[in-house]
Swiss-Prot record:
CDD domains, A to Z: cytochrome_b_C, Cytochrome_b_N
Residues the record lists as binding heme b b566: 97, 196
Entry note: cofactor: Binds 2 heme b groups non-covalently.
Paired cysteines (S-S): none
Membrane-spanning ranges: 33-53, 77-98, 113-133, 178-198, 226-246, 288-308, 320-340, 347-367
Cofactor: heme b
Subcellular location(s) of the protein: Mitochondrion inner membrane
Protein family: Belongs to the cytochrome b family.
UniProt organism field: Notiosorex cockrumi (Cockrum's desert shrew)
Function per UniProt: Component of the ubiquinol-cytochrome c reductase complex (complex III or cytochrome b-c1 complex) that is part of the mitochondrial respiratory chain. The b-c1 complex mediates electron transfer from ubiquinol to cytochrome c. Contributes to the generation of a proton gradient across the mitochondrial membrane that is then used for ATP synthesis.
Residues bound to heme b b562: 83, 182
Protein name (record): Cytochrome b
Length: 379
């Protein structure tokens, strides 16, 4: 009798995706982040579901309902902080996952990569709307500033902003619709992640060498299931440490003040994972230019396959490209730091230089360096 997992219509899909999947024998721990992102999404959906049971999306009671969750609901504080810090873990895994893709040339799987970029945008949109829900000062002013950026779009800008707000300012209508979207988007993300996986399994995984691994495949289970479990345990340990020892480490103290449209906080800034894009936005003095740069800073990832000029897929054997890659990482960390600083000298000029370097590295310097490496290898 044939094994049920190989014949049953549903079990067969699971079997071919997580059990008998032929996997390269040499993929490193940088390939763990896909499964970690899946775990993060599950944690976020579950904690979010329990939070939604107690949260009210009304401007008068939203802040109080979050306080009520933390004070009166059984382990409500734990659920709330797991959800808030779970988002940070989600983005850490996302950035490492994208960085891995850029380093090892995984972007040459075009469909998988493009859906991945779409997923990145969806997660960023979800996180932004989630940050608005507690209705603290930074929630309100963050929502006001970021949605206001759309007014830079010529002709339809101001109408579009009022349409998103549902009125003439960020108010009850905005909060209600943000809650609705914040609830539905994670399920869309889960569906997209399924499609992401579907396209990945059409080609099979890439590996650190960037060379075809068809001649040397091993089954996913037990080799990579056990490896993923180690990654998951480390993720849970980090998240638990963050939640139980310093849950507000990555948050903003201003968000413990209820939203007040009449009082602007001295420094409006988003959560840490958006700071790099926020720094790029602020480094351009023109509103429309800043908005374009903000969108392009992430949309530029779509161009990665077109900007690949190297004859080798991976950066594993390309020392100059490796060097530039780590300069890009350092540049992004610099932008993240600048995004959290006030708009004054010397932070303005540092942000502008870092922004120019970011786009120059991706669009010009790295492709030219790859061509140079081809020449050096007489290819």
């Amino acid at each position: 009798m044939t094994n049920l997992r190989k014949t049953h219509p549903l079990m067969k899909i699971i079997n071919n995706s997580f059990i008998d999947l032929p996997t390269p024998s040499n993929i490193s721990s940088w390939w763990n982040f896909g499964s970690l992102l899946g775990i993060c999404l599950i944690i976020q959906i579950l904690t979010g579901l329990f939070l939604a049971m107690h949260y009210t999306s009304d401007t008068l009671t939203a802040f109080s309902s979050v306080t009520h969750i933390c004070r009166d609901v059984n382990y409500g504080w734990l659920i709330r902080y797991l959800h808030a810090n779970g988002a940070s873990m989600f983005f850490i895994c996302l950035f490492l996952h994208v960085g891995r893709g850029l380093y090892y040339g995984s972007y040459l799987f075009m469909e998988t990569w493009n859906i991945g970029v779409l997923l990145l945008f969806a997660v960023m949109a979800t996180a932004f709307m989630g940050y608005v829900l507690p209705w603290g000062q930074m929630s309100f002013w963050g929502a006001t500033v970021i949605t206001n950026l759309l007014s830079a779009i010529p002709y339809i800008g101001s109408d579009l902003v009022q349409w998103i707000w549902g009125g003439f300012s960020v108010d009850k209508a905005t909060l209600t619709r943000f809650f609705a979207f914040h609830f539905i988007l994670p399920f869309i993300i889960a569906a997209l992640a399924g499609v992401h996986l579907l396209f990945l399994h059409e080609t099979g995984s890439n590996n650190p060498s960037g060379i075809s691994s068809d001649a040397d495949k091993i089954p996913f289970h037990p080799y990579y299931t056990i490896k993923d479990i180690l990654g998951i345990l480390l993720l849970i340990l980090t998240l638990a440490s963050l939640v139980l020892f310093s849950p507000d480490l990555l948050g903003d103290p201003d968000n413990y003040t209820p939203a007040n449209p009449l009082n602007t906080p001295p420094h409006i800034k988003p959560e840490w994972y958006f700071l790099f894009a926020y720094a790029i936005l602020r480094s351009i003095p023109n509103k429309l230019g800043g908005v374009l740069a903000l969108v392009l800073s992430i949309l530029i990832l779509i161009l990665s396959p077109l900007l690949h000029t190297a004859k080798q897929r991976s950066m594993m054997f390309r020392p100059f490209s490796q060097c530039l890659f780590w300069i890009l990482v350092a540049d992004l960390l610099t932008l993240t730091w600048i995004g959290g600083q006030p708009v004054e000298h010397p932070f303005i000029i540092i942000g502008q230089v870092a922004s120019i370097l970011y786009f120059s590295l991706i669009l010009i310097i790295m492709p030219i360096t790859s061509l140079l490496e081809n020449k050096m290898l007489k290819w």
